[in-house]
Amino acid sequence: MLQRVDDTRAFAFDPRGRVESTETPLAPRPVALAGLRLGILDNSKWNANKLLRGAAEALSGEVAFAAVNYYVKHSFSKDATPELLARIAAECDIVLTAIGDCGSCCSCCVRDSIALERLGRPAACIITTEFVKETQLTLVALGMPGLRPVVIDHPVSSITAEEVALRVGQIVQQAQVVWTA
């Protein structure tokens, strides 16, 4: 509530608040991807499975991973549980998460990636072009502005098999850079 304390001065209330966070460094990046264990975190959003399985297959054609482990969280509008994140960090060296193509799922996908980075696992978070600004705001607010997302064309939920394949190409091209750069 805004109260007038002094009749000679006017005060303005700024409802935006202030975001203060401590910047967290990214997880150490590997020099090469061959021989690493790839983790796939599917947030169960429409077409996330198709995108992630397609990306895993395409990436495995380019990189000799030691293993590819697939995990599903059953709510795209909630963060992954600490137990699931700990399991992924224990069983994988790098992680691919998807999909951020709406407000809540994008926020949670980004938050999952940040949590994995804090557990020491480079994470490539797939978002769509419509949510780049929101992703950057989330990364800054949570103290990891240096985490680069994998950005694919929007939309995702209502696309054809051919469009899925095009987006898989975008993922493959960017994810390797996110993990190693």
Predicted regions and their residues:
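Short, well-structured alpha-helical segments in soluble
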Residues: T81-D93, D112, I171
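Structural motif
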Residues: E23, S75-A86, V164-A165
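Short beta-strand elements in bilobed, periplasmic/extracellular small-molecule ligand-binding domains
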Residues: G61-H74, G146-D153
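Helix-enriched interaction subdomains in cytosolic or periplasmic regions
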Residues: M1-G17
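Glycine-rich phosphate/diphosphate-binding loop of Rossmann-like nucleotide-binding domains
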Residues: L36, I40-E57
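Active-site-proximal loop->helix
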Residues: V110, R118, V132-P145
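A charged, well-structured terminal subsegment
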Residues: V150-A181
